[in-house]
Amino acid sequence: MTPRTPRYAVSRAAVSVTSVLALLALGACSSDPNSIAEQAKKGDQKGYIAGNGAIEQIPVDQRLKPVTLEGTTLDGRQWSSTSERGKQVVVVNLWGSWCPPCIEEIPDLEKVWTDVQAAGKPVQFMGIDFREDPQRGAAFVKTQRMTYPSLTDESGVLILAFGRQAPTSPPSTLVLDREGRVAARANGAVSATTLQGLIDDVLKSES
């Protein structure tokens, strides 16, 4: 009698085939080596893209209402995402000095921030110092030489602005399109290559 294939094996195979087909479909839409689709084809950041759901890109016609994120930066300035609406893509990164993965991804975030500025791309970075005394957060920013601004969020309420799309814990990164809608999310530390790909894909989706 021929042994039966375990049901879980069939399910896993089906999921794998579905993931591959989805990535191939994405690849057909882009030839940009920085795009997430091209990264998937090459295998870069494969764990993020094909399997654990850490990266999500939202098509233009499926994006929800604009997010209004506002607060006080660690250097005492008032800021609102509405001031960027219609002009710039906003990259929001949730972090804390008490979070080891957050510390590890800082060089990658800094690299992308420096690169988009040098290239003159319409992109603004804004961190959220999550559940931390602002003085401690400000000292950490100085020590780590973080050049992009961050909002202070000692009470942990700013993420409520994202509604059901709110990140659950740091590190998390969200990319808002120029209309202020969440266009991409990365749950967990993100590499410079992946973040640049997400940003470029959002910029192209609105061109």
Explain the meaning of each model-derived region.
Residues 103-144, 154-161:
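Structural microenvironment flanking redox-active thiols in thiol-disulfide oxidoreductases
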Residues 139-147, 153-206:
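Thiol/disulfide oxidoreductase modules built on the thioredoxin-like
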Residues 29, 99-102:
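Short cysteine clusters
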Residues 93-99:
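Aromatic-flanked redox-active Cys/Sec active sites in thiol-based oxidoreductases
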Residues 91-92, 125:
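Hydrophobic beta-strand anchors of alpha/beta hydrolase catalytic cores
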Residues 1-70, 207:
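N-terminal targeting signals for export/organelle localization
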Residues 61-63, 68-90:
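A short beta-strand-turn-helix
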